[in-house]
Amino acid sequence: MLNTLEIMERIPHRYPFLLVDRILEMDVENKRVIGRKNVTINEEFFNGHFPGHPIMPGVLIVEGMAQCLGVLVMEGQKGKVPYFAAVENVKFKQPVRPGDTITYDVKVEKIRSNIVKASGIALVDEVKVAEASFTFCIADK
C-alpha cells in the first residue's frame, strides 16, 4: 500500500533509523496498520550486535512497530512529530536475524488529545518474535 518514499513523507525517520520498508495495510477506521521490514546483513546495527552472531536489537523491533503506528496516526498532521512517551509489557520471544522479514501488526487502543496508546506484535514467518504496548505523544516540531 505504501512504499518507503511514501512512508518517509509521513514520518521523520531516515536511514539508518527507518525501520519499516513497506506498509501492507492501513485501516484508518479501525486504527490498525500492518508493515514490513526486510532485515539484511547490511543493517548498521549488525556491526556491533553481535559480530559473528548477528541479532537485531529488540528495542529496534519495538521502534519498527512504533514507526508503523506513526505512519497511521500522522496522516494529515503537518508540522507535528510523534515522540515515544512509554513502553510497557515488552516481550521478546525469538531472535531476528539477517534474511528475516518482520511483519509488524499494530493497533491503536486509545487516542486522547495528542496522546496515543497502542499495542503491537512482530512476526517472522508467522511466528511471534516480539510484542509491546506503547504510548507516544504527537507534538509540534
Predicted feature locations:
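HotDog/MaoC-like acyl-thioester-processing domains
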Residues: 30-32, 96-100, 107-141
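Conserved positions in beta-strands of structured domains
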Residues: 21-24, 88, 93, 107-109, ...
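Beta-strand-rich interaction surfaces with strong enrichment in secreted/lumenal proteins
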Residues: 8, 52, 92-94
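Hydrophobic beta-strand-centered segment that forms part of the acyl-chain substrate-binding groove
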Residues: 1, 68-103, 129, 133-137
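Hydrophobic core residues within well-ordered beta-strands of beta-rich domains
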Residues: 17-19, 102, 116
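Short aromatic-glycine motifs in intrinsically disordered, low-complexity regions
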Residues: 1-14
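Active-site helix/loop of acyl-thioester processing domains in fatty-acid/polyketide metabolism
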Residues: 23, 56-79
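Catalytic strand-loop segment that frames the active site of acyl-thioester-processing enzymes
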Residues: 15-56
